[in-house]
UniProtKB/Swiss-Prot annotation:
Membrane topology field: Multi-pass membrane protein
Organism name: Xenopus laevis
Source organism phylogeny: Eukaryota, Metazoa, Chordata, Craniata, Vertebrata
Transmembrane segments: 40-60, 78-98
Protein name: Transmembrane protein 263-B
Region (Disordered): 1-33
Length: 114
């Protein structure tokens, strides 16, 4: 018996089976749109979205993803996310969002010669 077969036998049946059809009705699928705010401070931007929220998240780009005030999220495209008090840059597949970045990001400063 191979290791793969041993792992499949060790997994409980409820992990291997498909969820019943009625299980999805409690958590409906999110429909495409510009920006939707969900309770608890979670912001969601969906495909083709360009948008901003006051005191929340501003993001420009494609594919859908969800961001919380401190989250690490998988994003299949390139873009920039901004959180009040912090900045997040999305490059490739991972975005880290949080206020801990705010001390490392500063605005454009003028030279003394200007």
């Amino acid at each position: 018996m191979s290791e793969t077969e041993k792992i499949e036998e060790a997994a409980p049946p409820y992990l291997c089976e498909e969820p019943p059809e009625g299980a999805v009705k409690d958590h409906p699928q999110q429909q495409p749109g510009m920006i939707s705010r969900v309770t608890g401070g979670i912001f969601s931007l969906t495909r083709g979205a360009v948008g901003a929220t006051i005191g929340g998240v501003a993001w420009i780009g494609g594919k859908s993803f969800e961001v919380t005030k401190t989250a690490v999220t998988s994003v299949p495209s390139i873009g920039v996310g901004i959180v009040k008090g912090g900045v997040s840059v999305v490059t490739g597949s991972v975005a880290a969002v949080g206020s801990a970045v705010s001390n490392k990001v500063s605005g454009k400063k003028k030279d003394k010669s200007d």
